[in-house]
Amino acid sequence: MARLTRRTFAIEPDVSEKMDALVDGHTLEANLLINKALRHYLEWGRFVENFKLVVSDPRLMKLLWSHLTVEEAREMGLQNGNSAVVEFILYYFRKFDLESVLKTFRVIGAEYSNAFAYSESGDDRNRTIILRHSMGQSASAYYGASLKALSVRLGMEVELEETDDQLVCKIRRVDKEQAIAPKTPKAK
């Protein structure tokens, strides 16, 4: 079991009552709940407002993607991958490298947004990323264009396989990976 750090803090009475009802008096469950809520805020919630991120029902997203052509979705993904996602990654991780790009897709796209199921395999030179989503070809085109734009910016070769229900992205290092530092100095 992981070593825990003890902290003492006060919570509002209505939050305490809801938490007690949810965990039914089990201390361990209360600790897990609090850790999960804090982790969710630290890894996701505090960035939602700054970048105007939202979590949407996958059925709604499937409907949205069905109203875009594959080329329109690909263009949106390319624009997003060349601007907003780079800014988000630099803000969130304070660096822009392959690991931060993949972690963004894994944590933000899969774990918190539930936009797709993420799987990854490979080594330092070659990676295969699979995003399973069941939202149509346009969703694959969007995610593929975004991931490709980010990877190419890092000096990597990318091969995409897009289907109606998933994107397979094969990334290969060409030479030395390029990394981009944030524009603003890190706060001390």
Model-found features: residue ranges?
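Short Lys/Arg-rich basic patches
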Residues: M1-P13, D20-V23
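Short beta-strand micro-motifs in enzyme catalytic cores
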Residues: T5-R7, R127, D165-C169
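Charge-rich, low-complexity segments
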Residues: E12-V15, G45, E49-K62, V70-E75
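Juxtamembrane and targeting peptides
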Residues: K18-D20, E43
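Short, basic amphipathic alpha-helical segments that act as recognition/interaction helices
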Residues: L28-F51
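An N-terminal amphipathic alpha-helical segment
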Residues: P58-I129
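Short, hydrophobic/π-rich interface segment
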Residues: G109-D165
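Short terminal or interdomain "cap/linker" segment that borders an active site or interface and mediates
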Residues: V158-K188
